[in-house]
Amino acid sequence: MTRLLRAHPEISVEYDDGQLVVTWSGRREPVEVCNRWRVEESWWREPIARDYFKVVGPHWLALIYFDRVAGSWHLERLYD
């Protein structure tokens, strides 16, 4: 089962000592990247330019993205 989050909360992503670390809701989670892809589209209103990453950690599997327009990281989906 997967939970698509209606609002995509901003998260922190760091590269720490050879490990990718995601911080969300006060929790630091070391993760590995399973897959990545880029989406670039121009909608009638605002352009979308995102780098998506499917990541797995000790406690969850998630879909995160880097919004290249805003310069921020977000959590889009959690997998159970």
Residue ranges of model-derived segments:
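Non-catalytic peripheral regions of nucleotide-handling enzymes
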Residues: M1-D80
